[in-house]
């Protein structure tokens, strides 16, 4: 975004409004092109309370076809989400091809709060950020365009805006005790935000765009500029036949399994029927015990079956689950993806079926 253009446009409110409207028209055009080319777009808008996230998002979507986007406002996870992997609820909201997903707060808000509260120690926080980078990289490798905005305001400006909200009966509810507590720890949050940038502001991946939002009109103009530039670049890449993902893909990953290769597997019968019945009954009883233990300790388990047609997957699953509590497991048959699944990232349909804590999912 050219600072000269922003400065010139800022000279008059009318001039800036014209520039914003022009950006909006271009954004609407690019939305149509992304839809035609099947480009999924994910936009993250983060910032401290009263930084103007809602205003910026509202200005983003005004020129867009409302059938082509969805805004997700991320609050604290509900009971069901708490029982799932951290990124589960965000995977479910990732955009399909030709649609745009806009997040008012995101997976980052959880990590900022967890760092401030001490809910996650240094090692756990490092792992969480590793998971976030992998999540974003997987989406990018699948063709998703990701833009991340962070709106900055000073503590003084935040205090003024919070007071204004509190003074209006229609908006006072937005200033909760949690919001005031975050404001009181402004410096701690700034430190956590800087740590977030260190972990996830990678120019080759999905860089952060930091925007001063003291003047919301200027901030809107700047955010629209970044969004238009990114979508224009992606559309041009697609038209030129270039791959959507430009980074280096991970290759040559080591195999951590000690399982023998199929060529070396012994497929001959090794047990007589009586011995088999005795062993399987003992092992099914043990599986029942372990299933109860998984539930007690709130440990989720995913079991994956692969094999040729008629190789015995169904029979094996039936024996596996014979003594398991049916309320604690689910079998997910996997076939060719349908049209909805094809329009999403390859892993989307599997993430949506991940088990709750203490439950078992068998694919």
Say what each PLM segment does:
Residues 1-363:
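Glycine-rich phosphate-binding loop of ATP-dependent small-molecule kinases
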């Amino acid at each position: 975004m050219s600072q000269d253009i922003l400065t010139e446009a800022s000279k008059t409110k009318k001039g800036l409004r014209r520039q914003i409207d022009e950006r909006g028209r271009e954004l609407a055009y690019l939305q149509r092109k992304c839809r035609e080319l099947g480009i999924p777009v994910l936009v993250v808008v983060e910032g401290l309370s009263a930084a103007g996230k809602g205003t910026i998002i509202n200005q983003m979507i005004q020129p867009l076809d409302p059938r082509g986007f969805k805004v997700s406002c991320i609050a604290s996870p509900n009971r069901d989400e708490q029982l799932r992997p951290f990124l589960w609820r965000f995977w479910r909201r990732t955009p399909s091809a030709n649609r745009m997903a806009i997040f008012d707060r995101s997976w980052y808000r959880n990590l900022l709060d967890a760092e401030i509260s001490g809910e996650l120690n240094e090692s756990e926080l490092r792992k969480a950020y590793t998971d976030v980078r992998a999540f974003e990289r997987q989406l990018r490798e699948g063709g998703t365009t990701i833009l991340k905005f962070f709106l900055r305001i000073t503590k003084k400006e935040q205090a003024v805006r919070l007071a204004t909200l509190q003074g209006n009966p229609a908006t006072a509810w937005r200033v909760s005790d949690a919001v005031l507590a975050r404001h009181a720890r402004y410096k701690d949050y700034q430190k956590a935000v800087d740590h977030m940038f260190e972990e996830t502001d990678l120019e080759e991946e999905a860089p952060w765009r930091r925007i001063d939002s003291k003047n919301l009109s200027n901030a809107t103009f700047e955010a629209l500029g970044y969004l238009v530039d990114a979508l224009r670049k992606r559309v041009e890449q697609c038209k030129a036949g270039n791959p959507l993902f430009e980074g280096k893909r991970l290759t040559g990953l080591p195999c951590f399994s000690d399982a023998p290769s199929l060529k070396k597997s012994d497929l001959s019968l090794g047990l007589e029927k009586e011995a088999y019945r005795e062993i399987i009954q003992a092992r099914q009883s043990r599986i029942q015990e372990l299933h109860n233990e998984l539930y007690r300790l709130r440990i989720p388990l995913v079991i994956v079956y692969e094999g040729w047609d008629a190789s015995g997957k169904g029979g094996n699953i039936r024996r596996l689950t014979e003594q398991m509590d049916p309320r604690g497991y689910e079998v997910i048959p996997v076939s060719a993806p349908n049209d909805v699944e094809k329009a999403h990232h390859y892993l989307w349909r599997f993430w949506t079926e991940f088990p709750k804590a203490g439950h078992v999912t068998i694919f």
